[in-house]
């Protein structure tokens, strides 16, 4: 089974890669540059992940996507929402819904997965692997099982070899993802979750908070934070 992987270097995509390699041949990983704040970090860390596993890495530039996007992920005049762990656990639904709206990029996952399907078909790969997961599906519908099923139906018409989406995290929350990734020895020290692209993760954006909560609840120390702390000693 050969596949193309969507790789942002975030917790989910790195974990999905580790799981996929346990069961299949990942032919290539694709990282997308659509002008997001964290793009340099995503490319840097994705490259390290691919070097770790010996996988070909391609960067796909989508400058047109940033030009039609008014989101805090791209527009630096807009503030990226800051959340607390309590907001994620006990906060009202509108807090995470408002955060999701602030970082929403029009049809981003739809664009990414269709490009990946083109690579998959051209290289004789049967699957596109994505880090879609059950936790984020609650606020991002393009992470859901329904989205995956709809895309599979579309690909049955738009690809000659019937490419399918493989989402190994689709029923998992972030705590389960961390535990599985650590079990498989995924190089999470090379994963970048922050919406920002500063030298250090901000620690307060929704993505950082979900990662922080997941590691706390899992009982594991975050290898990325530990690696940076060790480097400073």
Curated annotation (Swiss-Prot):
Pathway: Purine metabolism; 7-cyano-7-deazaguanine biosynthesis. Keywords: ATP-binding, Ligase, Metal-binding, Nucleotide-binding, Zinc. It catalyses: 7-carboxy-7-deazaguanine + NH4(+) + ATP = 7-cyano-7-deazaguanine + ADP + phosphate + H2O + H(+). Its cofactor is Zn(2+). Zn(2+) binds at residues 194, 202, 205, 208. ATP binds at residues 7-17. It is an enzyme of class 6 (ligase). The keyword Membrane does not apply. One of its GO terms (molecular function) is zinc ion binding. NCBIfam families: 7-cyano-7-deazaguanine synthase QueC. Belongs to the QueC family. This is 7-cyano-7-deazaguanine synthase. It comes from Methanococcoides burtonii (strain DSM 6242 / NBRC 107633 / OCM 468 / ACE-M). The lineage of its organism: Archaea, Methanobacteriati, Methanobacteriota, Stenosarchaea group, Methanomicrobia. The gene is queC.
């Amino acid at each position: 089974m050969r596949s193309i992987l969507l790789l942002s270097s975030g917790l989910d995509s790195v974990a999905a890669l580790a799981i996929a390699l346990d069961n299949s041949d990942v032919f290539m990983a694709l990282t997308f540059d659509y002008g997001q704040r964290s793009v340099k970090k995503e490319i840097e860390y994705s490259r390290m992940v691919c070097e770790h596993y010996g996988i070909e890495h391609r960067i796909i530039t989508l400058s047109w996507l940033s030009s039609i996007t008014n989101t805090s992920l791209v527009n630096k005049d807009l503030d990226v929402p800051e959340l607390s762990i309590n907001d994620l656990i006990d906060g009202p639904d509108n807090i995470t819904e408002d955060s999701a709206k602030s970082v929403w990029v029009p049809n981003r996952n739809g664009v990414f997965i269709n490009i990946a399907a083109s690579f998959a078909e051209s290289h004789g790969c049967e699957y596109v692997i994505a880090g879609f997961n059950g936790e984020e599906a609650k606020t991002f519908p393009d992470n859901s099982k329904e989205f995956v099923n709809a895309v599979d139906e579309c690909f049955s018409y738009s690809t000659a070899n019937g490419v399918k989406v493989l989402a190994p995290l689709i029923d998992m929350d972030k705590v389960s993802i961390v535990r599985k990734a650590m079990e498989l020895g995924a190089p999470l020290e090379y994963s970048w979750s922050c919406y920002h692209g500063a030298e250090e993760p901000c620690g307060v954006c929704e993505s950082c908070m979900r990662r922080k909560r997941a590691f706390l609840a899992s009982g594991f120390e975050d290898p990325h934070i530990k690696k940076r702390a060790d480097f400073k000693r």
